[in-house]
Amino acid sequence: MTDRIVPATLVFREDGTVVSPLYGDIYHSAAGALAQADHVFIRGNGLPERWRHERAFTIIETGFGTGCNFLATWAAWRADPSHCERLHFVSVEKHPFAREDLRRAAAHIVAYTTITTITPIAPLVDELANAWPALTPGVHRLEFDDGRITLTLVFGDALDVLPNLALRAHAFYLDGFAPSKNADLWSPAIFKSLAKLADERATFATYTSSGAVKRALDEAGFAYRKVDGFAGKRAMLVGEFAPRWRVRRHEPPRAFSTDRRDAIVIGAGLAGCAVVERLAARGWHVTLIERRERIASEASGNPAGVFHPMIARDDNLAARLSRAGFLHALHRWRALERAGHAFSRSTHGLVQLATSDDEFERMRESIDALGVPAELASALSRDDARALLRTDVAHGGWLFAQGGSISPAALAAAQCAAAGDRLSRIVGVEIARLERGGDGRWRALDASGATIAQASVVVVANAADAARIAGLRHAPTQRVRGQLTLLPPGSAPAVPLPVIGDGYVVPLANGVTLTGATYEPDDTDATPREAGHRENLERLERLLPAFSANALDAGALAGRVGFRCVASDRLPLVGELGDEAAAAREAAALTGARLRDVPRATGLYGAFGYGSRGLVWAALGAELIAAQIDGEPWPLERELAEAIDPARFLVRALRHGRVA
């Protein structure tokens, strides 16, 4: 189980500095947090000059604390007319402040700063606090200044999370509590983890000049030197990554190398449109190819879909992935709405009901054991559920305060609108296969062999057809038929928000109630059937006992059929595809391969196999693909990215000698 997050306690000393009762140390110098950030970390890393020569620049910080190093760096970037196009700031924090404590601490520090040469920071404090995520373990990605500033917060113990990051760092801010107060954050293991993430030209800066820190830096491959410290401190350390021997087996990720930033996305459902928006936001020109005449015509064309995280007592991979996807989706959707790209979604929460009293007890215990914040999920007794839903229920459950329902087609349209003139659409055309030319560019071909489009990068996002088009033999997916049912106004309990459990019920704006859905593997019938409606009505009766399945004529009801694409392990396939032909040639040498050893199909990516969780997973999957293409910090832990890596099935086949 993932360790629960213990928030920091906000305490001020008499001199106005913020202090940690847990570590018995101050977060910043009494001479000023922002001045310290400027002297030690910004100037200590040769900034802003060094980022002027990069399209994107990545900083890692050990210890986010009050956020002042990030705020000072953000302000310095704003003040520099020659700044890099995109600035990535990645910060690890074991004990993050709660939102309002962070706001108070940062606002207090800014109010008492004496710096006058940096862009005003006070307005940035509220932007940061307003975007502050729920205090759950893992990676949280926030964006500011139209996505040009990316803050990737990693909540957890640095010893555990640093080895699980995937990125290439240009600068390190080493800013934990003093080595005498928090020795773990200055241990050799920390610096070895940082060395595995360092760009060849990476620099570092830290306020300490401890002998133990110098030895750990040297052992990890960092060269250091002493310079004048801040506010009368005799010395601090700065330096660069300069290993005298090999310190890592794998190089950190690089950007995809191409002279032309153009891409093809195949499939205009939730998966594909999310990728379109994320690539276009980074300046890529995208051609979207859809076999139907309009976008979101297949499973993504349902009137509504529900979104919520999954909670499991052991906080397994699927639960962690759904939580990360859910929180990231909310962040992206709000950004779309702020940009004027509106779409229909409910904002009053979602209730998940237990199917038995024993299940309810397990649900309640899971919330307590994991320390789940109430803003993410809370236990709901049977009486409270009855009052909230205004109808009878058999058991209690969970309330997901930020869950709800959404129109998938409207979301897809908003994402395409956000892409603007960087998006070209080709509809009514079916791609049969892909081919990479001698010039390194991919061509999308129809059944006759005609080239429909060509680009440097291709993302296959067309569900169950993706593996076939990409020529994958080791990507086991299955079509699962799902039939939903539409109930006329007044024929079902008028619940004020979506309810899930054994099935789901969603109130639509026109008074119609949506319920479903069947789960029928390998059934390709696209026509709604009376038996499917009857199954949905019976499921609704179990979910909401005030409803009678016999009150309606199942044969007279309207509905819709969609097809889920489900992988054999029930996790999506997201990321760069494996080169199966190259793997076959090297099979003998790859029997013990890990994912990072597998040859890749350069420029070919996948986003499919989302099953019933497209709303939860699509935004995060799109961000991961865009980050991989552009060599940016990944928006989730490497362990989670590897769990959904499309090449995972190829690795398993190699280990069992099934690739030839």
UniProtKB/Swiss-Prot annotation:
Its cofactor is FAD. It holds the Pfam family DAO. It catalyses: 5-aminomethyl-2-thiouridine(34) in tRNA + S-adenosyl-L-methionine = 5-methylaminomethyl-2-thiouridine(34) in tRNA + S-adenosyl-L-homocysteine + H(+). GO terms for cellular component: cytoplasm. It is found in: Cytoplasm. The keyword Transferase applies. Keywords: Cytoplasm, FAD, Flavoprotein, Methyltransferase, Multifunctional enzyme, Oxidoreductase, S-adenosyl-L-methionine, Transferase, tRNA processing. This is tRNA 5-methylaminomethyl-2-thiouridine biosynthesis bifunctional protein MnmC. It comes from Burkholderia pseudomallei (strain K96243).
